[in-house]
Amino acid sequence: MKALKIALTKGRLERDAVALLKKAGIDCSSMLDKKRKLIFHSNSQPVSFILVKAVDVMTYVKHGVADIGIVGKDVLMEASKSHYEMLDLEIGKCQFCLASTPDFDPSNYRRKIIATKYPTVASKFFREKGEDVEIIKIEGSVEIAPVLGLADAIIDIVETGSTLKENGLLIYEKMYPISARLIVNKASLKQNKTQIFQLIDQLEQAIKEERTK
């Protein structure tokens, strides 16, 4: 039986994903002693894991290097769809929010400058509102953009809001909820349908158990 290759997002989402996979009965023991390794093979099940950055999960899945990926909905919303989004894993929960300084006027967005790491998401949001804004893409810490006068407001993902508070920003609009999703390569789903749906069934059961805690 061919081993399923699963691409995981490095960092906190990786830890949450591994915990959920373990609960679903997937052998993740090879990842206990990671050191600098990025590829891991199970000794007891036909499964292997690849650790990559969030934005690269989709690339590995798209090109079939990974059969399955676990990545945040924020990454999926920003990129073109070239996969099947199969399951909301209900981990890594946060939210897209619009935030700015206390003197910001949210009643009129006309010609406002919005800084964000997610220009596609921001464009969609303001298009739905019928607002004409200028969107600036920033790769680093967007929180300082309104403080330094680069932008009138920001759009970013928010979990607790502590970083915004530390930089003197307030949340003015809560936009889209985010959580980690299971995505599958289109060709892999045809070739490994039984294996993949078995994994999905196991994960769904684990998610249900988490809900009842």
Curated annotation (Swiss-Prot):
One of its GO terms (biological process) is L-histidine biosynthetic process. Its EC number is 2.4.2.17. CDD domains: PBP2_HisGs (cd13595). It catalyses: 1-(5-phospho-beta-D-ribosyl)-ATP + diphosphate = 5-phospho-alpha-D-ribose 1-diphosphate + ATP. Its main location: cytoplasm. Pathway: Amino-acid biosynthesis; L-histidine biosynthesis; L-histidine from 5-phospho-alpha-D-ribose 1-diphosphate: step 1/9. One of its GO terms (molecular function) is ATP binding. InterPro entries: ATP_PRibTrfase_cat, ATP_PRibTrfase_CS, ATP_PRibTrfase_HisG, ATP_PRibTrfase_HisG_short. The keyword Cell membrane does not apply. It comes from the Bacteria. Keywords: Amino-acid biosynthesis, ATP-binding, Cytoplasm, Glycosyltransferase, Histidine biosynthesis, Nucleotide-binding, Transferase. Pfam families: HisG. It is found in: Cytoplasm. GO terms for cellular component: cytoplasm. HAMAP family: HisG_Short. PANTHER family: ATP PHOSPHORIBOSYLTRANSFERASE, ATP PHOSPHORIBOSYLTRANSFERASE ATP-PRTASE. Lacks the C-terminal regulatory region which is replaced by HisZ. Belongs to the ATP phosphoribosyltransferase family. Short subfamily. Heteromultimer composed of HisG and HisZ subunits. Catalyzes the condensation of ATP and 5-phosphoribose 1-diphosphate to form N'-(5'-phosphoribosyl)-ATP (PR-ATP). Has a crucial role in the pathway because the rate of histidine biosynthesis seems to be controlled primarily by regulation of HisG enzymatic activity. This is ATP phosphoribosyltransferase. The gene is hisG.
